[in-house]
Amino acid sequence: MSLPMNSLYSLTWGDYGTSLVSAIQLLRCHGDLVDCTLAAGGRSFPAHKIVLCAASPFLLDLLKNTPCKHPVVMLAGVNANDLEALLEFVYRGEVSVDHAQLPSLLQAAQCLNIQGLAPQTVTKDDYTTHSIQLQHMIPQHHDQDQLIATIATAPQQTVHAQVVEDIHHQGQILQATTQTNAAGQQQTIVTTDAAKHDQAVIQAFLPARKRKPRVKKMSPTAPKISKVEGMDTIMGTPTSSHGSGSVQQVLGENGAEGQLLSSTPIIKSEGQKVETIVTMDPNNMIPVTSANAATGEITPAQGATGSSGGNTSGVLSTPKAKRAKHPPGTEKPRSRSQSEQPATCPICYAVIRQSRNLRRHLELRHFAKPGVKKEKKTTSGKKSSSGSSGSGSGALSSSGSVPQVQTVQSLHTLQGVQVKKDPDAQQQQQQQQQQQQQQQQAMTVSGATGGQVQQQVQQVQQQVQQQQQQQQQQQQQLQHHQIIDSSGNITTATTSAQAAAAAQQQAAGQQQQLVAQSDGSESGAPLSIAQVQTLQGHQIIGNLNQVNMTDFQQQQPQQQQQQQQQQQQQQQQQQQTQQTL
């Protein structure tokens, strides 16, 4: 018997269902070809889109509108253990759970509309209700009536899906919100981002833990607003620099036990930056002040019932540039800049009320520059005064042996001018006096032989050269002091060190002449050297003023007496040495 040519052969895979289920389970265990991730309770579970869509119409509508290759579905309000059990049920068709976990598992299955676990399935056509059989899930030691009663008392839920575009990530964020009638609110958020890793996205969208509401610290002078039971409060915050505001409405629920909702808008504009943070506490409502960066003002938020006086708009105006006046007792805390804060002087440790005055304090108290004073004390402690204004001599002289200060008259008369003498000139004068005494001692010693005379002449020459070098240094170091009298004239005052040096040179020249003449014809060459040296002294003396000559003549007798005494002492010493020899 032959078969027809158009007959079809039926090939049957005996264990098709078992083999396919086992193959899908292996792919899931090894993580191969997974194209989506479910996350809940801080854990993530890789899965396959085709399996999830076949098991849940809700996930089918959610994932087919997602162009992302590997979306990450965040399930808020679903326990991680329940999600793991649901995936086990989807991939294997059965799951074993504890009796305590069964209500939460069935509630999660109802939220996700998992086929085979949802007790009721609502269609869009005729809204008919289909019952499902749960006998295969109920163990023998559980009561069937009790389980069905538990499922019946669970709140009915309605699922809504919404698609939101995200421009920054160039993708789509699918947001699904599950609302309940009496048990509160539950949210299921689906996010897609191909650029980020799955784990990073999971950590970013983990469900937030319950924390205490943050209340920004305020100054003790800031006003506080307490909550009034059964009252609806309307808060207004500025949204732009033109004064237009957005109204934040806080609604009360269930009478006195209302739930306060707050928002934290951040508004940025070109002219100024305003940041408003409002935090409400059911027991003590303390609004956080809004800081204006442009004007530097701090504006505390106030309720409409206390500040608007019956105005239902709920918009609070923000001052722009000027500070608004407030009645006494309600002043706003002023923001103090760094320059207005107190500072401490690092030298005297004085407290300055404003830090901008610290520099002025240092300049006046610690680093003040000495100005021109009218009167200055001399080193001897005595003040030298000028003569009478009618005489107009203007010559000042001290009581010392050497003239210390010499003034040059100006065209106008000086009134009450006093000059401080130069300490450097005094030291130079003392050195010159010592050198002069040594010269006198060397010149008074007369030797019997010509060799001693030549040695004396050489010593005198060396001393004269030293004096010339000192005079050059003195001329470089001399300073001219400017003196301003009462009439506004400026005169110059010079020290009399130059006059004293010239007088000393003259005395040295005279002494050299005496020594050369006392030597006689035996020392002809030294005589000519002494004469040449005295010529320089005569030239310097000829350039001196008459005042210097008078001062020198007054001092000359004293110097001669000193020289005679020194000569006598030297002669006595020579006689003693000769006697000893």
Swiss-Prot record:
Location of the region described as Disordered in the Swiss-Prot/TrEMBL record: 298-343, 364-404
Compositional bias annotation for Low complexity: 381-401
Alphabetized GO MF terms: chromatin binding; core promoter sequence-specific DNA binding; DNA binding; DNA-binding transcription activator activity; DNA-binding transcription activator activity, RNA polymerase II-specific; DNA-binding transcription factor activity; DNA-binding transcription factor activity, RNA polymerase II-specific; identical protein binding
Pfam families linked: BTB, GAGA
Tissue distribution of the protein: Expressed in the central nervous system throughout development.
Renumbered zinc finger spans (C2H2-type): 343-366
Keywords annotated in UniProt: Activator, Cell cycle, Cell division, Chromatin regulator, Chromosome, Developmental protein, Differentiation, DNA-binding, Metal-binding, Mitosis, Nucleus, Oogenesis, Phosphoprotein, Repressor, Transcription, Transcription regulation, Zinc, Zinc-finger
One GO-annotated biological process of the protein: cell division
Domain of life: Eukaryota
Residues bearing the modification Phosphothreonine: T237
The keyword Metal-binding is annotated on this UniProt entry: yes
Residues spanning the signal sequence: none
A single GO cellular-component term on record: polytene chromosome
Processing after translation: The N-terminus is blocked.
Free-text domain note: The N-terminal BTB domain mediates protein oligomerization. The C-terminal glutamine-rich region is required for transcriptional activation activity.
Subunit and partners: Interacts with Bin1, lolal, corto, ttk and ph-p. Interacts with FACT subunits Ssrp and dre4/SPT16. Interacts with E(bx). Upon ecdysone stimulation, interacts with Nup98.
Biological function: Transcriptional activator that functions by regulating chromatin structure. Overcomes the repressive effects of chromatin by promoting the open chromatin conformation in promoter gene regions, thereby allowing access to other transcription factors. Binds to DNA Polycomb response elements (PREs) at the bithorax complex and to the proximal region of the engrailed promoter, and positively regulates transcription of many genes including homeotic ones.
UniProt protein name: Transcription activator GAGA
Source species: Drosophila melanogaster
